[in-house]
């Protein structure tokens, strides 16, 4: 019985986290659109992993990782080296599958979203090889 209860709690926690992540992605996509970015893809799946948002403005493609945390301070430290490497690999797959985008280059942004809906975008948050 305890094992069943633990699995149920994990499942519910996972569903809440997914819903929170989707809400944060909605907030991030709206913020990008207000700044003139066209959101090309949401939750883009590639062989190397998923990209939360892919956006383009003036020929520049931004691969955006969205992080939802209780506070902006906590979210700012939520992207580790392994996640950065995964995002770079996923971006390479996306570019290969979507030729013609990004003639002005690509970059990696992070949008951090606090529980109160406050969002902050860190443009060019890291570079390949960081």
Where are these regions (language model features)?
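Acidic-basic catalytic patches of nuclease active cores, encompassing PD-(D/E)XK
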Residues: 1-42
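A generic beta-sheet turn/junction motif
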Residues: 46-48, 57-59, 115
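Mg2+/Mn2+-dependent nuclease catalytic core
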Residues: 70-93, 97
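Protein kinase-like catalytic core scaffold
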Residues: 49, 60-62, 109, 120
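Domain-level recognition of nuclease-like catalytic cores that cleave nucleotide substrates
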Residues: 3-5, 98-130
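Short beta-strand or tight-loop elements
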Residues: 35-36, 47-51, 104-106
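Conserved catalytic cores of phosphodiester-cleaving nucleases, focusing on short active-site segments
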Residues: 51-75, 87
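Hydrophobic residues on conserved beta-strands that form the core of alpha/beta folds
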Residues: 39-41, 63, 108
């Amino acid at each position: 019985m305890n094992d069943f209860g633990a699995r149920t709690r994990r499942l519910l926690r996972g569903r809440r986290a997914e819903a929170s992540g989707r809400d944060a992605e909605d907030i991030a996509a709206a913020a990008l659109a207000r700044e003139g970015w066209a959101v090309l893809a949401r939750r883009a799946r590639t062989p190397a992993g998923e990209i939360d948002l892919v956006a383009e403005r003036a020929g520049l493609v931004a691969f955006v990782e969205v992080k939802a945390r209780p506070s902006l301070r906590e979210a700012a430290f939520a992207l580790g080296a392994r996640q950065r490497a995964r995002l770079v690999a996923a971006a390479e797959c996306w570019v290969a599958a979507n030729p013609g985008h990004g003639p002005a280059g690509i970059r990696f942004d992070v949008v951090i979203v606090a529980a109160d809906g406050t969002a902050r975008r860190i443009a060019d948050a890291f570079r390949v090889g960081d």
